[in-house]
Amino acid sequence: MRQSKFFMPTLKEAPSDAVAESHKLMIRGGYIRQVTAGVYAYLPLGYRVLRKAESIIEQEMDNINVPEMMMPHLLPATLWQESGRYQKYGAEMFKLKDRHGRESLLGPTHEETFTEIIAKNLKSYKQMPLALYQIQTKFRDENRPRFGLLRGREFVMLDGYSFAATREQLDQQFDDQKSAYKRIFKRAGVTVHPVIADSGTMGGKNSTEFQAPAAIGEDTIATNEKGTYAANLEMAKSIDTFKQEPEEAKELTKVATPACDTIKKLAEFLDVPATRIVKSILYIADDQKVLVLIRGDKQINEVKLGHVLDADDIHEANTEDLKEITGSEKGGVGPVNADWADKIIADETVKGLYNVVVGAGETDYQFKNANLDRDFKVDEFADIRTANEGEPDPVDHLPLKFTTSIEVGHIFKLGTYYTKTMGADFLDQNGKAQPVIMGSYGIGVTRMLSAVVEQHLTDRGVAWPKEIAPFEIHIVQMKMNKEDQTELAEKLEKKFSEKYDVLYDDRKERAGVKFADADLVGAPVRITIGKKAADGIVEVKRPTDEKAVEMSIDELDKFVNQELG
């Protein structure tokens, strides 16, 4: 490809609203251009990277015998209403009506559509296990699209779905997909951690995220140094090392605690450690009033709480509801005589506490010396707390380390979440109707590209991994009016183009402009044709090298083969 004919509008400076380094690089390098908030055009350079990433995915899906197909972008609302996700998905869904008033949506994901097709076309256990996938543009009406391709309203995604007759088949499909995803990310050059994750609105109870460590990441993952434990902070577990020595139960005493609206203020006012305080927070779970208890030095993890309550709508009670239900404002709520609560759930940190401080059910008042069972009851204990960095992990008891990261993939064991609702049944070996068992698998392809850039930035540009680099070799000719340089450049272009993607900079530009653009292209091998061309000597540089190295043509062949294979 001749650079003089290649559309690559580079910029010296990134737009002021670009925050993420990957966003800046992709704008400056002429990879993408914004059309509107959260929507981007992929220019030739960016589209080459995208297609190479898609090619890796296609190859790895072929390797596990998963065929590709294509679903429509425009979906009928009735399918999502049938699954129950039409309202649950919320404002992120692009909804529209046609001229006849029929409701439709732009697909943010395709579980319902695949399930409907399977329900109509898969009838026997003999047709399973089966898996399908597509690579397609998705649409989500993000409230705050930002960071370029990391959080957009339109993005390219691999979404795959598996269909099984037994749990054993699903487990094997899940493992096959997980292994394929690891290979995809490795080939794309992005470092990832597979972590325990929340399934969110996707449904199902078992899922794994693939998180790419990056400073701009919006997620936090908890890992140990051995790599034997990794979880999204939303689901991370840790060992609570605090132990209170047993005490004789003291008399329950009501005390005034004016203006103590935080645990810190309350602890200072009563001269007790936060571990002597039990926080009480009222949640509304569907129509149930649930009082949630946790030790004062810990924080409630609402994702974990959601799994315990298993309700469609869970939210903390507002000030008005709190006063009406409990008779107290926030801080005074407590578990003693809490007959108004439909259920009391406590974090495991509340076990083994003696003579603690709890809300007295009245604004600005607390009970001292409250004891479990004597003064209040708990219906259920569960791990509903947020893990803290440095706490021991639950596997090897090593300190947890927190890292910001980008979610680039997510795989789910959906089970029968969709198939039961949508009537996707098959006949088993005994001729009995059973719901198909599903899995769901996704990679944010355009998001993955941003993650690659974040992990492979250089001082001047980017160092693309060879399998997704827009060009593997970049030939840069210094003087276009020098015949010896042109002759050598064209010779190398012809030779290397037989095996590699080659960009030949044949522009009549200054050396500084050419080198600056080459840094933004980030080809694994840059070959500069300069004043020693007549002697068969070129300069070779990788994006991460400080300086170029002179080589003969014979040495160049060996170097290219070593770098690119």
From Swiss-Prot:
The keyword Repeat does not apply. Its EC number is 6.1.1.15. It is found in: Cytoplasm. It holds the Pfam family tRNA_edit. One of its GO terms (molecular function) is catalytic activity, acting on a protein. Keywords: Aminoacyl-tRNA synthetase, ATP-binding, Cytoplasm, Ligase, Nucleotide-binding, Protein biosynthesis. It catalyses: tRNA(Pro) + L-proline + ATP = L-prolyl-tRNA(Pro) + AMP + diphosphate. One of its GO terms (cellular component) is cytosol. GO terms for biological process: prolyl-tRNA aminoacylation. HAMAP family: Pro_tRNA_synth_type1. Consists of three domains: the N-terminal catalytic domain, the editing domain and the C-terminal anticodon-binding domain. Catalyzes the attachment of proline to tRNA(Pro) in a two-step reaction: proline is first activated by ATP to form Pro-AMP and then transferred to the acceptor end of tRNA(Pro). As ProRS can inadvertently accommodate and process non-cognate amino acids such as alanine and cysteine, to avoid such errors it has two additional distinct editing activities against alanine. One activity is designated as 'pretransfer' editing and involves the tRNA(Pro)-independent hydrolysis of activated Ala-AMP. Belongs to the class-II aminoacyl-tRNA synthetase family. ProS type 1 subfamily. This is Proline--tRNA ligase. It comes from Lactobacillus acidophilus (strain ATCC 700396 / NCK56 / N2 / NCFM).
